[in-house]
Amino acid sequence: VSRRQSAPRLEFEAAAIYEYPEHLRPWLEALPKQPGVYFFHGESDAMPLYIGKSINIRSRVLSHLRTPDEAAMLRQSRRITWMQTAGELGALLLEARLIKEQQPLFNKRLRRNRQLCSLQITGGKPQVVYARDVDFSHAPGLHGLFANRRAALQALQTLADAQQLCYGVLGLESLTRGRACFRFALKRCAGACCGKESIEQHDARLKEGLAALSVTCWPWQGAIALKETRDDMTHYHIIHNWFWLGAVDTLDDATALLRAPAGFDHDGYKILCKPLLAGGYEIIELSVPEAR
């Protein structure tokens, strides 16, 4: 019996319908080969469609124009602008702030997370603590930065599985007095729940595992200026408690930015922690005006 041949399946790939955005060519000539932040603008002058950053603005923007998956954004774009920075660090910080402030249509949404939390050992057990209640820039003994309580407990559970820790002792599940937990029978718990190992041994492994997640306290008395330089451009990044207050051209201008940060900035911490502690930048300590 002959089988009727089916019509070939049409696959609408982005590449098949992609057209090079010729209408954006006038904006390409002046693109700098320097670090900074760039903007794809649509019809609205108030809000860009997309904000990006790169150590080479020109190269990165041109790569967008050759990417079929970004055809929708490119079709809506009408012009391209940019802001140069003194280096990659400045580009990272400026991009993160502008995306939060302007919420471009084609960027992943970045918002201040009111559920940001961490793990802290209190009374011998790890507890979930929140940035809204605890100053994460100065509180000692914080481990991990998590989007919400569920993510924090999931990380603790993953650590328990790796270290054969007891869910019951950690407070992740209830225990019946005098009886081993279910995971002990499966050899997934080393037995702190039933005396097979001491609580001290259990807690030592817990602390060892949490050490890799330690949140670094702000190591300076107050605000600092981080000097970033390239060619003929120098910026001083004014930072306090892992919060980027902005950048200025000279230290004399820093006073205008000095203020107490409005809470812990997760994105600022992620961007700044390693570069600041690595010692690769000149750091100038600043005084912060006292609150009146």
PLM segments and residue spans:
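Acidic, glycine-enriched active-site microenvironments
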Residues: 1-292
